[in-house]
């Protein structure tokens, strides 16, 4: 089903980051820290599997999620703080504007790689499943600005093959073997099923490098 396919995409990303500390941030109308940074990917996978327990409404607080990830990385070494943001790019909730959140991230040494998926009123191909993404278009320009202001990269994915290629490129940009800390796409607890069904959600993961 759609939810299982969505989790599979994120689980695959985790598998690619052996050696990273990974933590989950969940968000809908607000952002919440679900797990601390950890090298125990199995526990994060378990949390990912259990992450959707309800709905927080048709909303996505991108700015708040960026701010929370930035806060979680403040105690990590300078130069190794990375946020990989996987989202439809439509900010519909929260108290902090994404552009302002990006500036805060930059000022705290956090680099953001923004990955836009779905949107355009079409469907996202996930392991052969066509997942309807709703009528909202992805705010590519906004995501490009978020990535640019923090010294990161912007990527566009419309299917899982594209996501796989993007993950590989990000892996090359942020090698696991390097010392330091990183933040990976955060994950949102309540709106996850709605995110994939309507294309208005945000998926993200907080990751910190192993020293």
Walk through the language-model features, giving the residues of each.
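Membrane-embedded segments
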Residues: 1-80, 95
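Short beta-strands and strand-coil junctions in structured, solvent-facing domains, enriched
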Residues: 11-12, 31-33, 91-93, 120-122, ...
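Active-site-proximal beta-strand/loop segments in catalytic clefts of secreted hydrolases
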Residues: 25-28, 86-89, 115-118, 157-160
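Residue-level signature of catalytic and energy-coupling elements of molecular machines
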Residues: 44, 69, 84, 112, ...
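Scaffold/interface architecture of coatomer-like assemblies
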Residues: 44, 154-155
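VWA/integrin I-like adhesion module and closely mimicked acidic/polar interface patches used
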Residues: 57-60, 80-82, 89-149, 167
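Juxtamembrane amphipathic/hinge helix adjacent to a transmembrane helix
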Residues: 157-189
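C-terminal signal-anchor/stop-transfer transmembrane helix together with its immediate cytosolic
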Residues: 176-211
